[in-house]
A protein has these predicted regions:
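Catalytic-core segments of class I nucleotidyltransferases/pyrophosphorylases
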Residues: 22-95, 99-113
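Short, intrinsically disordered, charge-balanced linker/junction segments flanking boundaries
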Residues: 115-121
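Short beta-strand-to-loop element that shapes/binds the nucleotide-sugar donor at the catalytic cleft/hinge
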Residues: 1-14
């Protein structure tokens, strides 16, 4: 997962009171409380292949969007009693979206800074 300042558009990591993973809620399905969560799903995941295939076979369309959400699979696995962990391991700048010229400029600045740093080390 990643913690970002503006999680608009991203799936949110929902945790219980003890900080354990509960689910991933897509932005368009999120409540106001969930939209306030800054921990997001950056679309990186590791699964046991057999368990993933079993879960995909049970996956239903989201009633709001009509889409199939891969992000529903970890909650399904959790509900089936399987161990699901969500680790905060992705730097915020590695999950930035590029949908506008301003976002492109931001990512360009970050990349140029990284390239300059690599060139000097």
């Amino acid at each position: 997962t990643s913690i970002i300042d503006d999680p608009t558009g991203y799936g949110r990591i929902v945790r219980d009171a003890q900080g354990r993973f509960v689910s991933i809620t897509e932005h368009k399905n999120a409540t106001e409380e969930e939209r306030a969560i800054q921990e997001i799903y950056p679309s990186y995941a590791c699964f046991d292949v057999q368990r993933l295939l079993e879960s995909l076979a049970k996956l239903d369309r989201d009633p709001l969007s009509g889409e199939y959400y891969l992000t529903d699979v970890p909650a399904m696995m959790h509900g089936d009693g399987l161990k699901v962990e969500a680790l905060t391991a992705v730097p915020a700048e590695d999950v930035l979206s590029i949908n506008t010229p301003a976002q492109l400029a931001e990512v360009d600045t970050i990349l140029r800074g990284r390239l300059q740093m690599e060139a000097t080390t």
